[in-house]
């Protein structure tokens, strides 16, 4: 852990340098490949890890090798992971989905922004130096049209986004021929449907049933289609965002790019400080992954942070502002009802959700029902016009182990189920947010309750944290719970960084949180028996047994840390071919001994086989040639 503390000026300068020098970068010994679909512009990016051959015999001067197949893996880095792509943050990413959106001919460009706040910001010349220059003209659905992926799916339409996702979810495993790599243990899926091959039709069917969502606002054409659902790979979200006391636009864009490099499937911008609107524009125009927000945070800024002064009109304007910028999903705390707030009074830690506490305070101060609940149908109409997915927030999630699985938590969950059915009336895609702090033996009930109460809509959880005693290590405490609930059926895991409960995460914290949660998600995929999930594990184990150190580094989720730890004790190049590591040394390496045992056993088998043949030869009279009937 670094002890160097940079000043705010130094942090911004460092982030600006990162952006100015940004270029497409591949991981060590990996290359970007594209798998094409039925039409030429469906090109699905993947990372292919190149492996070295295995020494199988021969002499010192004439060694014999066997090639090892390259291993394709899911890649969230977008153009940032392709060395052939020129990156210019000032211009933003290419608009991958624009031709698909235009071809559907069910949306139209707006003459002006619908949000009064957006118009006000655009008219402010003082913001010119902060503003992203290549602003898009926003689009929305034509009158009488539904333009959501859920609507298309229900109409039996397989969109290019769905085909893109089907290819992506298969992770190129059809390229793998080795039986050793393809071997997989049967999983326990807890009722999930996991087909051997994911087809575009399967994607369409899951979306139509509401079991999966494709967050894809028509005003975010730069995003690469992805899916969140129980019957697909477990996804990971990373949170970024400035606050009133720290971080800048440059730093948030840097965190975005960094997040996609380390495996974030979606990113939530939770900014609460100055220039929220401008920061979000820079993030969206440079994001290859879906972007989510909590609109109540910005609405609160518009009323100077006074929760009691919030109004539906201010919130509605914020929804329009963000939808026309391209936000792919909104967290809406519409399940925090007035009658549920007293249930939290006996809790140890009360209401810990920022959005939940804001709405609870508003309800109590006005003694009225939550205006998000009261205006929920209008929220759905807005979302349907841009294809913004809803992430129904758990404003009453438990903030401590003691408060887990209480009446307030599950009362809200049941209300979220009712709201889900309303959203589906408008063809709006929905996922459900979950806890929180839950001990291990109480986690599965959360998944069971969600499936039953929310009609199998995808579950999206923060952890859960399995103990409260480890500030500074809550990426571990929550990673345990995340792996478990992912196995039970949770569709997306919201990462927790080492700074949870302590401060705003920096770039290194983001990486630590993501690596922890990629481990949890992958462990869940293995346990569920997701087809092809074990390929990378098998490739790693084979490389480990064969002392192919470079391949071990490159197959790792974090090749740089794996290499650095190895080189702390064996830095010489000879250490990269040694048949041992510094843990056991050359004489006590279990894998080296296992290889010797295997070689010895093979030699013994040959010797025994030769002895058997010799005895058989003598038993038949010792003749070199036998009559046919004697052979």
Swiss-Prot record:
Q: Please name the InterPro entries in this protein's record.
A: ThiC, ThiC-associated_dom, ThiC/Bza_core_dom, ThiC/BzaA/B
Instruction: Provide the protein name.
Output: Phosphomethylpyrimidine synthase
Metabolic or biological pathway: Cofactor biosynthesis; thiamine diphosphate biosynthesis
Positions with a binding annotation for Zn(2+) = 437, 501
Q: What reaction does this enzyme carry out catalytically?
A: 5-amino-1-(5-phospho-beta-D-ribosyl)imidazole + S-adenosyl-L-methionine = 4-amino-2-methyl-5-(phosphooxymethyl)pyrimidine + CO + 5'-deoxyadenosine + formate + L-methionine + 3 H(+)
Q: Which family, according to UniProt?
A: Belongs to the ThiC family.
Q: What subunit structure does UniProt give?
A: Homodimer.
Its GO CC terms are: cytosol
Q: Cite the PANTHER family for this sequence.
A: PHOSPHOMETHYLPYRIMIDINE SYNTHASE, CHLOROPLASTIC, THIAMINE BIOSYNTHESIS PROTEIN THIC
Single biological process term from Gene Ontology: thiamine biosynthetic process
What would be an example GO MF term here?
zinc ion binding
Q: What's its EC?
A: 4.1.99.17
UniProt keywords, alphabetically: 4Fe-4S, Iron, Iron-sulfur, Lyase, Metal-binding, S-adenosyl-L-methionine, Thiamine biosynthesis, Zinc
Q: List cystine links.
A: none
Naturally occurring in which organism (per UniProt) = Salmonella enteritidis PT4 (strain P125109)
Q: What does this protein do?
A: Catalyzes the synthesis of the hydroxymethylpyrimidine phosphate (HMP-P) moiety of thiamine from aminoimidazole ribotide (AIR) in a radical S-adenosyl-L-methionine (SAM)-dependent reaction.
